[in-house]
């Protein structure tokens, strides 16, 4: 397990090279890693020895297998098989349970014959909120209210009935495992009289078997239309420790200036609270394993179950991608986005969260930013040059001579400032590629109740120059990869100014990526620091949720 790496920093003034990683989270990370990989260790031990001592001193065979749809989930090979049946209709109350199970156990397969306007709800271990509350058809990859079409992938299958005019006739089959320690309640919600016919196949385990800490969740999004070209469509905003199991997304083209797939691709902003790093895609078809558009093909892990091609600039489609062989893990959070271009977009993300994780952090991120740009980088001497900028609140436009530069007022999200959807090629209607060989300035104000030492934690994949209270603090060169630097500064009592010149060139491997992450590592009470500018007469307020 990688805990941190040595950072290359060009130290100027207060900058200090150091190891990354939040020490306060180290023990928690080790604990979670042990719990996460314990089934694999037990599987190895059982394969070598065949038996493991039980709590009562007797020997008992304890072997585990990897789930074929989600190999990150390891489950006991010793179990009792059960089936819960439902053959009813939704009553006046608008909901009905199709299964109520007592654990420890795991749902292995659900077959459903539902109505056409039904939503699926799954609540395990008496959680205060259901882990899954999604319209049933999108959950199974039938997007935008379309008539069901055949789907055959690792996570689920849909078998439409060829007879027309029979509502609720497709057979929906779910193969994503649903582990639970205490209980599992599966509910269908919908109009009175809709079918609620189901068979739920599940395994029950003895209490002394280790059960995976991962619990299945789903996130549903629908925008009609989505934001215009160059913006992003948020697939999921996840807090916690876990991994991404899959995604399905459907497009109905409304913007006919270019192909519907040319959105700029997916972005994953991971672990902003602990170890910021990124995963960047290309375009939609590339992210789902295709090239040069889509074809009506399905495989176990990626496919296109529905596609309408009325011409190059008029296509609709639904595409799935499941990460069985290559799961995307995160320790504290995941922001999952894809490019947007004004089309109708619907998505479902499937992920597992680790219920054993504590998710504590002692870092605070500035919330409100002023960003201004762009400045071309003609020669390398331009990189560290500071353009004169107003000291007070920036106006809507900043002028350098007679050249205007628009000011953007952004809110960070889990510490991330995503500039690829601010600065992109706007002179054409095709893929909105991120601007290269340009610089922008990002400024925020940090309130401190006293003089104290702070560690600025800045993550990026190119170059940045940092000024703290008007003095240059560091220059960071990260052209080879997305890395994190710690810069030691000393605050004054009251308002402190952090100014970052962020540079995007074609040097890094991820040249489509332009995002930075900023946080402050605290050694003492976080109440002595505020990442939000305090206005006169303003008292303490709860930190608002970041938004798009």
Where in the sequence are the language-model features?
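Solvent-exposed beta-strand/loop surfaces of large extracellular or lumenal domains
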Residues: 467-487
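Beta-strand-centric surfaces of beta-sandwich/beta-rich domains
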Residues: 58-362
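Accessory carbohydrate-binding/adhesion or oligomerization-edge regions at the termini
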Residues: 357-428, 497-548
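C-terminal segment of classical bacterial N-terminal signal peptides
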Residues: 45-54
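Aromatic-lined ligand-binding clefts that engage carbohydrates, nucleic acids, or primary amines
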Residues: 448, 452-467, 498
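Short strand-edge motifs at loop-to-beta-strand transitions and within beta-strands
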Residues: 174, 320, 442-444, 483-487
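Bacterial N-terminal signal peptides that target proteins for export
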Residues: 27-39
């Amino acid at each position: 397990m990688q805990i941190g790496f040595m950072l290359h920093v060009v130290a100027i003034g207060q900058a200090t090279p150091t190891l990354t990683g939040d020490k306060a989270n180290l023990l928690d990370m080790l604990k979670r890693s042990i719990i996460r990989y314990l089934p694999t260790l037990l599987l190895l031990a059982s394969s070598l020895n065949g038996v493991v001592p039980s709590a009562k001193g007797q020997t008992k065979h304890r072997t585990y297998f990897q789930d074929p749809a989600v190999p990150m989930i390891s489950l006991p090979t010793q179990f009792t098989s059960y089936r819960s049946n439902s053959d009813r209709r939704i009553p006046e109350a608008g909901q009905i349970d199709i299964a109520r199970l007592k654990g420890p156990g795991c749902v292995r397969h659900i077959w459903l014959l539902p109505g056409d306007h039904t939503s699926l709800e799954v609540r395990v271990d008496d959680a205060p909120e259901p882990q899954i509350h999604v319209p049933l058809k999108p959950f199974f990859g039938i997007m935008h209210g379309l008539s069901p079409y055949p789907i055959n992938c690792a996570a689920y299958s849909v078998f439409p009935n060829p007879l027309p005019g029979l509502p609720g006739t497709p057979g929906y089959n779910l193969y994503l495992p649903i582990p639970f320690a205490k209980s599992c309640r599966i509910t269908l919600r919908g109009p009175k009289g809709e079918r609620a016919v189901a068979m739920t196949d599940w395994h029950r385990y003895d209490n002394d078997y280790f059960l995976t800490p991962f619990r299945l969740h789903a996130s549903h999004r629908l925008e009609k239309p989505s934001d215009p070209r160059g913006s992003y469509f948020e697939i999921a905003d996840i807090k916690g420790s876990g991994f991404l199991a899959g995604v399905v997304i459907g497009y109905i083209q409304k913007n006919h200036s270019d192909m519907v797939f040319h959105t700029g691709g997916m972005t994953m902003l991971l672990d902003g609270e602990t170890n910021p790093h990124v995963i960047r895609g290309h375009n939609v078809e590339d992210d789902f394993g295709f090239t040069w558009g889509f074809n009506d093909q399905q495989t176990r892990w990626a496919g296109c179950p529905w596609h309408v091609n009325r011409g190059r600039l008029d296509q609709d489609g639904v595409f799935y991608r499941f990460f069985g062989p290559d799961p995307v893990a995160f320790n504290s959070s995941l922001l999952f986005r894809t490019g947007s271009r004004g089309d109708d977009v619907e998505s479902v993300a499937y992920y597992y969260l680790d219920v054993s994780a504590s998710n504590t952090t002692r870092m605070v991120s500035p919330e409100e930013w002023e960003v201004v740009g762009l400045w071309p980088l003609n020669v390398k001497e331009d990189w560290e040059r500071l353009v004169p900028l107003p000291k007070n609140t920036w106006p809507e436009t900043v002028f350098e001579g007679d050249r205007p530069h628009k000011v953007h007022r952004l809110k960070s999200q889990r510490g991330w400032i995503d500039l690829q959807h601010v600065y992109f090629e706007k002179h054409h209607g095709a893929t909105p590629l991120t601007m290269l060989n340009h610089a922008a300035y990002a400024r925020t104000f940090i309130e401190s109740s006293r003089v104290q030492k702070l560690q600025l934690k800045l993550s990026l994949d190119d170059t940045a120059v940092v000024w703290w209270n008007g003095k240059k603090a560091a220059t960071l060169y990260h052209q080879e990869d997305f890395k994190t630097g710690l810069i030691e500064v000393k605050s004054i009592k009251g308002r402190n100014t952090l100014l970052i010149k962020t540079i995007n060139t074609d040097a890094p491997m991820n040249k489509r990526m332009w995002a930075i992450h900023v946080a402050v590592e605290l050694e003492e009470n976080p109440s002595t620091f505020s990442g939000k500018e305090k206005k006169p007469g303003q008292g303490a307020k709860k930190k608002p949720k970041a938004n798009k």
